[in-house]
From Swiss-Prot:
Entry-linked SUPFAM superfamilies: Composite domain of metallo-dependent hydrolases, Metallo-dependent hydrolases
Cofactor note: Binds 1 zinc or iron ion per subunit.
Catalytic activity reported: 4-imidazolone-5-propanoate + H2O = N-formimidoyl-L-glutamate
Protein name, per record: Imidazolonepropionase
Annotated 4-imidazolone-5-propanoate binding sites: 75, 138, 171, 239, 316
TM annotation in the entry: none
Gene3D superfamilies recorded: Metal-dependent hydrolases, Urease, subunit C, domain 1
Record InterPro entries: Amidohydro-rel, HutI, Metal-dep_hydrolase_composite, Metal_Hydrolase
């Protein structure tokens, strides 16, 4: 069905800029954008349906390119403890922290994980999200990593949202491998990753490169295996210290390196040369009350593409609003509203390997867009909350009104 969407203003986000078309119209057909431009220039095509958007601003559908949306349990009790002065180390010694999420995730059935994750993903969708990445990483063995990735696939089948699944088995050391990190990396490379990839559950491979997780050398072994299986890689890097994980990621043409508070100018140069996207996660920065800012000037100076994401997870960023992350990106990281919007559209698409098909309003790309109740694009970063999406369209079909 061909649909003509008109009486709107479009922030197309081509080349990562607002690239505004005033009094715009969009023609969609077969799930794609067939034409976009000024309303007065609409080509003489026969539309099966004409939709008046009432002067709304239209942007690409939002893309949350870094989430841990599938998990069991609840860690709000730890939040209370931390506010009372209990350290993370003390919480971990009591069996809390990521270990508690691993236990709860392992204990939960696939259907239970699906039900809880569905609510979180739907909350993001109500914010205008049409594409989301979901990582595993709370199973830490083949059976439970498979369970998490199956849930991610099922969410993409059951909900009107595009889901990309990332294997993050190298997220933390499982209790059965205490003191044997190298053995665990071997297990991921030799057993887990080949099996999960063969089952079609993996779109990319991620790891956590940090003193409290895995070393650059261990991550590199994982990257070599992933690339050998034809899978792109991503990396949690430079969140708590500088191990030059982002440079390692760039060496393997990673789709993205994420967090990056402690990255250096050398790392930024390497990422720029490789085309690796910097995914900034202000929710975790805020929730943990961190003070080390990502090097925004270096990222801009060297032309690194910058994305923003929610980092939705139970321990460090229980954020169910990607629009809130737009504001945090501006207020915490000194991004401009234009940079922030590019960070959840075109650059987020690139961070998922979807830059050719998603993230901007261009002919031939998927017809994913949101019509907003706003006066100008900067309002999306300005307002804290509010029911701003007027219509959400995915693959040319309206999914909310």
């Amino acid at each position: 069905m061909r649909t003509l969407w008109q009486h709107c203003h479009a922030a197309t986000m081509t080349e990562g800029r607002y690239s505004v078309i005033e009094d715009a119209a969009i023609v969609t057909s077969a799930g794609l954008i067939e034409w976009i431009g000024p309303r007065g220039d609409v080509p003489p095509v026969t539309a099966d349906r004409v939709v008046d958007l009432g002067g709304a601003w239209v942007t690409p559908g939002l893309i949350d390119c870094h989430t841990h949306a599938v998990f069991g349990g609840n860690r709000s009790g730890e939040f209370e403890q931390r506010l009372q002065g209990v350290s993370y180390a003390e919480i971990a010694a009591q069996g809390g922290g990521i270990a508690s999420t691993v236990r709860a995730t392992r204990a939960a059935s696939e259907d239970a994980l699906l039900a809880s994750a569905r609510q979180r993903v739907q909350a993001l969708m109500r914010d205008g999200v049409t594409t989301i990445e979901i990582k595993s990483g709370y199973g830490l063995d083949l059976e439970n990593e498979r369970k998490m990735l199956r849930v991610a696939r099922r969410l993409g089948e059951e909900l009107p949202v595009t889901v990309r699944s990332t294997c993050l088995a190298a997220h933390a050391l499982p209790p059965e491998y205490t003191g044997r990190a190298d053995d665990y990396i071997d297990h991921i490379c030799e057993q887990m990753l080949p099996a999960l990839a063969a089952e079609g559950l993996v779109d990319a491979v991620d790891a956590f490169c940090e003193h409290l997780a895995f070393s650059p050398a261990q991550v590199e072994r994982l990257f070599i295996k992933a690339r050998g299986l034809g899978l792109p890689v991503k990396l949690h890097a430079e969140q708590l210290s500088s191990l030059h994980g982002s440079s390692l990621a760039a060496r393997y043409q990673a789709l993205s390196a994420d967090h990056l508070e402690f990255m250096t100018e050398e790392d930024a140069i390497a990422m720029a040369k490789a085309g690796t996207v910097a995914v900034l996660l202000p929710g975790a920065f805020y929730f943990l009350r961190e003070t080390q800012l990502p090097p925004m000037d270096a990222l801009r100076r060297h032309g690194v593409k910058i994305a923003l994401a929610s980092d939705l997870n139970p321990g460090t960023s229980p954020g169910l609003s990607l629009r809130l992350m737009l504001n945090m990106g501006c207020t915490c990281f000194r991004m401009t509203p234009e940079e922030a919007l590019a960070g959840v559209t075109l650059h987020a698409a690139t961070a998922l390997g979807l830059g050719h098909s998603h993230g901007s309003l261009e002919v031939g790309k998927v017809a994913d867009f949101v019509a907003w109740r706003i006066e100008r694009p900067a309002d999306l970063s300005y307002w804290l909350g509010g029911d701003l999406p007027k219509r959400v369209v995915r693959l040319g079909h309206e999914i909310s009104n």
